[in-house]
Amino acid sequence: MCMSVQTKVAVLKWIHHLFINIPHKMFNHIENLFPILMKSLSDNSDEVVQQTLVVMAEIISSKSPEAAITDSNAEMQNKYFTKFIINLLRIFSADRHLLEERGAFIIRELCILLSAEDIYKTLAEILLEESNLSFARTMIQTLNVILLTSSELFDLRNKLKDLESLVSILYISCIFNYYFKLCILL
């Protein structure tokens, strides 16, 4: 069955609407929706990919109790955030063409919808464990280009430039510790 771009976008907007208005009911269906949404990231249409990211951002940033977990630092986190990033990296690893052609678009859109710092930190943590060094190197190069050239990451670049405060220094050492380790390894 082949759906038009408009139909796909309309379905994604409806799913987004449902997650906003009745998240407690929608989280009962997340295990079925998650793989379908991940597959939609490979769609040829930018509009479909963009709307898929809007839905995923709603899911992975939800404060709904169904999505919450407590990490080792006793902070509440959304359990789907890391799951999404891991699956995104798997998709990029399996489909290098998607990474090369759409990877920057997907990462930039995520940085608009969510915290760029959280995205980069989580990507770095996961890539540190990546056994395929060729993929890790390609992904790091992609992330570097995005960080250096993307207007969506202007605030993050400014934070990295401003090393005058203790908070900035701690930010660099904590957030990008994993990222720098990966760069050194490669």
Where are the regions that the model predicts?
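Core helices of alpha-solenoid repeat scaffolds
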Residues: P23-P35, Q77-I86, E100, A116-Y120, ...
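Short inter-helical turns and helix N-cap capping residues of alpha-solenoid HEAT/ARM repeat scaffolds
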Residues: M3-S4, N44-D46, D95-R96, S131-N132
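Alpha-solenoid helical repeat scaffolds
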Residues: M1-I30, N73-Y80, F92
